[in-house]
Amino acid sequence: MPEVPPLPGAHALREVVDQVFADRGPLSRALPEFEPRPGQREMAVAVAETLETGGRILVEAGTGTGKTLAYLVPAILSRQRVLVSTGTKNLQEQIYFKDLPALAQALGVRFTATCMKGRANYLCLQRLETMCDMGASSSSGVRSPKSGHSKADTGRRTSDPGRRLPDPLLAMIAEWAQETKTGDRAELGDLPEDMALWNDLAATSETCVGSNCPHYDDCFITRMRRRAAQSDVVIVNHHLLCADAAVRQSEYGEVIPACAYGVIDEAHQLEDVATQYFGIAVSNYRVEQLCHEAEQVAASERREAAPEVAMARGQAIERLRDHARAFFMGLQLGRMAAADARAGGDGYMRGSGRRWAAPADAAGAEDRIRLTSEFLADNADAGHELAEALESVEQAFYEVRTAASADEPAGHSASEKRQAQQPEGREDALAIARRAGEIRDDLRFLLRAHDPDFVYYLETRGRGVFLRASPIEVAGIVRSQVLDRFQAVVLTSATLSVAGSFDYVRGRLGAHPAAELSLPSEFDYSQQTILYLPPRMPDPRSPAFAEAAATQIVEILERTRGRAFVLFTSYAMLRAVQPVVEAALSFPILVQGTGARSLLLQQFRTTPNAVLLATSSFWQGVDVAGEALSCVIVDKLPFASPADPVTSARIDAIARRGGEPFWEYQVPLAILTLQQGLGRLIRHRRDRGVLSVLDPRLRTKAYGQTFLAALPPAPVTSSLDAIGRFFGK
């Protein structure tokens, strides 16, 4: 573990940390760009005190505070293993590749660190070998490696000179597998983000057979876990943190090692991530992926399997495909019928005797529709047939007789075979059986739809149809499965409080009791920005709003010369405004959905005067420094749609316990979201620009003052000419 540098007169961790951030302290001497900031120093000392005494602290550190160093320094000097969880992979990599090496040099401290991502980011050697075996038999081509082998191997992956691959991408990955130390797909910079082949190669938990795998010792997940268990600082993201907590009780256990202390950065994102990972979902994609991989396993074992076993497997897979197609098509047709009914004015409200529980004003809910048990009952027969088909696949892949083996007694259930049969070399088949059983159990839970702690809904995305159940409240889950793991935990973000109170975030995350610290931004918003609010705009719910918003956006962008993010609360509004903006302006217009997020950001940074039209995924976790981003426009106050299933369920839950959902949930959530969106503009002391919110409710509604009070303390104007004068300074 790290050795605290000798600092005379300093004994407690907080005293050491305070001296590290002093005007002439180690950071000031060693880091050329370091500027002593009172807020950063105060936060660092508060974090140190929390680590020393235990418990929890909520720290809101305004943009420019330097919160990353403020928690990393006490974490490094604490002499305990510390977990740092971030909202994005970008921040993970910044900490691992930039901040920690700089601190190691500045502090003169020796420590080790591991950056851990979700399993799907890593290559599975077993799946690679299976793919190479299948590819090498098809034709001659590029040589591919034959990797890994028994647990007694030294860990060196060798090549089989007799194997060649026809697929150049597979050959490239196979070649890379021989050289990489991490197996992280991020090393393959030229690999398309949405490449289907990676889905067949990723080390997902669903396909993992754990210590039964012949590549277990060479496995990149195993090696990452071992590195982390020997590290002083473990860096993860919220997705891995919650996914790991969700599977901790499974037979494969957790990936993240035990850590004494935890730091959860970008903590405002944790509720949404927890809602996703502590829920249940069955989709046509999940079932089709099972069928696809079951076919691969069946093909690889066809020569060894008894003929009746091979036939049973093929029939079970085809039966599963047929029933999955019927079930998910039925759900899709039901969704379309409900959408038609809403368009005709029938709201299908819960309690009205209708099947669907979507509000009448369901605009924006086209992708997620809340379901009732009555609707699922209409699809129960198809659902039960699908569950039985999954049972057939489970049984077929637990059947492991070879052509030379004696017949086994009939009548054993799948679970009995699971316990009695663990034949060497059949781990892939057993993994397929296990997955089929898990999907069957999840499907039956979803079809029952009886747990009052969950909200049930149908989600469609592209060609995907997802039947989901999400926890209505995650506070208890987050507290028990995440926060209580640590002796001390720090939750921090630039946006945690509403109207000076942490009550909202504390309640949503179960973070009580907890100390509090709120630090203002280090930026001078009075000089760095202005806030433009249009003098007159239609009601956002009016059909006239889109045209008026497009006109205002064009007027603003003409004065800023592009260089802007225009953030929308819905794709519908983006699509309505896009043609007007493209026709009126000569600036390059980039639109979310036309390319990968990372590619769009890179284009924006490198294209002079660019304008990006985007929705939710660009409201946070995006940094563009300098003049390239000189304006951020928000079309409407970002209230979560009451038609969203999870939102509506949470509104109902608050109302049932006698609360006021609008003020307790909808307003605080919208304020934090708006702060994040507008926070994209000023990221450094030299940044300047214009903020604009087009929604007239900031001035016409009583709650508007609550929003205005939460915005950066910038001069407010309703004059478009003031924008031109601002940039003329």
Per-segment meaning from a language model:
Residues M1-A30, T63, Q80-V82, T86-S139, ...:
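A substrate-engagement module of RecA-like helicase motors
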Residues A48-E49, T68-R81, K98-A102:
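Walker A/P-loop NTP-binding motif
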Residues E52-Y71:
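Walker A/P-loop
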Residues L77, E93, S205-T207, S211-E388, ...:
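Signature of the SF2 helicase/ATPase Hel1-core->accessory helical subdomain module
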Residues V82-T88, V490-T492, R563-T569, S692-L694:
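Conserved RecA-like ASCE P-loop NTPase motor core of nucleic-acid helicases/translocases
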Residues W198-V234, C242-G253, L386, V393-E408, ...:
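A contiguous, basic/glycine-rich beta-loop/short-helix subdomain that forms a polymer-engagement track
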Residues P534-A544, T594-L698:
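Conserved RecA-like P-loop NTPase helicase motor core
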Residues T569-G593:
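Conserved helicase motor "Helicase C" RecA-like lobe of SF1/SF2 P-loop NTPases
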